[in-house]
């Protein structure tokens, strides 16, 4: 007889249209062919307005939440706020962490004390000067908001603040307006990368406290190249150049984010010349990539992450069954038929370009006969029943789940696809009620810890998988600063997770595409899908 398999979670860790750490897939859309035909062969016009201002217009989905990454981790939130607020340090496309608001810190011999000096006379948009006390306030607020608080868990005093027994972060000591130190509990190699994330942006304490619940809605003040003029759900967000920007003169006059939900309508508006930037959804990529008028305006990049299968081992702990599930998915077919050639079958959970990636590993394969044998060895000679739960907000995920349903039959796995709304999905995943689900995750900073960390903590580990050797390697990896040592440590850690315990197994690596007005130069996008316009211009 068949037995029900509980506890498989398909986790998407690839860049998505809405979230940095959750939610991915295609929006509901009209026919791409109809849209392309309606638009004809028109191309985008220059974004310069009649009075000579240079305003870039960006098509985007509606965040429908406050523009505050400390509370909401949607990627569209950060696409906007990254041009308004800044962190102490920044990141480059190759993973380096140069200065932004502070000079590179002096680090103690034991790698546990970081001494910072802020750059002089950095102004917030309200005219006040950046102070070290604003840095401390911003990091304490991050912990109080809880959403991404664990980024700072290695700072002395974090435990007390997160437990509610302390109101301030004792590990940060402010010496004066421009000098402060951060004390860690133990050496933590990715620390500077963590401080470069959008979650660690620096807010002016006085203005943020005064705004209260309106922070990110009617008020958002930073040190960035652009300041927020307006934000209206259902309409858009407008930004204007900050003339006192510490980074020097900015060519653009502003940014105009237009909230458009339908992916084809977004591209249609681009072809009409009404927007200058638009993401190209995989579902419509074949139509627009073959358009000769758009060929030179289509750009691609590979975000750091991959779609993966994660197993709730608290409910079902046999690695043979987890391996069987991994073998029952035809990744190549998904890449070709669902993602239309915009993705490739992975060899490693840790993406290329990050420490710990192993080039020597083979691709994860589709082998339903081997899956059958493994299920029989595990005590399931007649196969298993598996429920796949998907969030109806992301129809692309529904398509993947449906494809998986057909592919798994050959392995003796009977898949039921369950569709739920966002609220139900979040609750079920948090409480272990998802047998198999599709969501997304990709790195917040270019370090293997950002990829593997969710598998070590209860609050982020939806698989409920734990392995003592894996956890030990993770502790070793963050404690050493030697890159060669870290490479070997994380290779071993991933092998345990994806090739021995099969707690997580990748599905695909995706290439994201976007259309950009050819008159625009200097636009920057890094490997974590963050967009920066401060060096852009319109020719």
Residue ranges and their predicted role:
Residues 153-206:
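Surface-exposed binding/hinge segments that line
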Residues 21-33:
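Bacterial lipoprotein signal-peptidase II cleavage site
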Residues 242-288, 414:
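Ligand-site clamp/hinge motif
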Residues 61, 277-368, 392-395, 459-468, ...:
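Local pocket/hinge segments that shape ligand/substrate recognition
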Residues 329-356, 396-405, 426-539:
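Detector for C-terminal structural segments
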Residues 131-138, 177-181, 224-225, 252-254, ...:
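Alpha-helical secondary-structure segments
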Residues 103-151, 181:
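Aromatic- and charge-enriched surface segment that lines or borders ligand/interaction sites
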Residues 59-109, 221-222, 530:
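N-terminal lobe/hinge region of extracytoplasmic solute-binding protein
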């Amino acid at each position: 007889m068949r037995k029900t398999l509980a506890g498989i979670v398909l986790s998407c860790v690839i860049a998505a249209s809405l979230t940095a750490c959750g939610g991915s897939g295609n929006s509901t859309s009209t026919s791409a062919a109809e849209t392309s035909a309606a638009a004809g062969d028109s191309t985008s016009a220059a974004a310069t307005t009649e009075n000579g201002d240079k305003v870039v217009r960006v098509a985007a989905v509606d965040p429908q939440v406050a523009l505050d990454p400390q509370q909401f981790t949607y990627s569209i939130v950060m696409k906007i706020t990254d041009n308004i607020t800044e962190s102490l340090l920044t990141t480059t496309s190759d993973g380096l962490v140069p200065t932004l608001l502070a000079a590179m810190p002096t680090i103690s011999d034991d790698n546990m004390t970081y001494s910072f000096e802020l750059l002089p006379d950095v102004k917030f948009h309200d005219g006040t000067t950046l102070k070290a006390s604003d840095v401390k306030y911003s990091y304490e607020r991050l912990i109080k908001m809880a959403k991404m608080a664990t980024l700072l868990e290695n700072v002395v005093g974090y435990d007390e603040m997160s437990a509610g027994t302390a109101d301030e972060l004792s590990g940060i000591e402010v010496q004066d307006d421009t000098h402060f130190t951060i004390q860690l509990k133990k050496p933590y190699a990715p620390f500077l990368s963590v401080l470069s994330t959008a979650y660690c942006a620096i807010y002016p304490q006085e203005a943020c406290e005064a705004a209260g619940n309106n922070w990110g809605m009617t008020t958002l003040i930073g040190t960035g190249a652009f300041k927020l003029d307006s934000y209206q759900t259902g309409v858009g967000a407008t930004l204007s150049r900050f003339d006192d920007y510490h980074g020097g003169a900015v060519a653009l006059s502003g940014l105009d984010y237009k909230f458009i939900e339908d992916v084809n309508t977004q591209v249609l508006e681009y072809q009409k010349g009404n927007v200058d930037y638009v993401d190209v959804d995989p579902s419509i990529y074949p139509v627009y990539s073959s358009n000769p008028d758009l060929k030179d305006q289509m750009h691609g990049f590979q975000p750091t992450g991959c779609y993966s299968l994660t197993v709730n081992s608290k409910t079902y702990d046999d690695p043979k069954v987890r391996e069987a599930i991994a073998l029952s998915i035809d990744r190549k077919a998904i890449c070709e038929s669902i993602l239309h050639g915009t993705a490739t079958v992975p060899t490693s959970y840790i993406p290329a370009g990050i420490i710990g990636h192993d080039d020597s590993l083979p691709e994860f394969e589709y082998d339903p006969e081997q899956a059958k044998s493994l299920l029989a060895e595990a005590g399931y000679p007649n196969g298993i029943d598996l429920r796949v739960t998907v969030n109806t907000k992301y129809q692309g995920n529904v398509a993947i789940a449906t494809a998986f349903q057909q592919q798994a039959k050959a392995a003796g796995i009977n898949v039921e696809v369950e569709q739920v709304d966002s609220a139900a999905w979040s609750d079920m995943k948090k409480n272990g009620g998802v047998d198999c689900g599709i969501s997304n995750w990709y790195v917040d900073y270019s370090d293997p810890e950002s990829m593997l960390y969710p598998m070590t903590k209860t609050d982020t580990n939806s698989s409920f998988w734990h392995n003592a050797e894996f956890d030990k390697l993770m502790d070793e990896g963050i404690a050493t600063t030697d890159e060669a040592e870290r490479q070997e440590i994380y290779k071993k850690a991933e092998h345990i997770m994806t090739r021995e315990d099969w707690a997580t197994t990748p599905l695909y690596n995706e290439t994201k595409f976007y259309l950009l007005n050819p008159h625009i130069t200097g636009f920057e996008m890094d490997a974590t899908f963050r967009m920066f316009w401060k060096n852009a211009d319109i020719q």
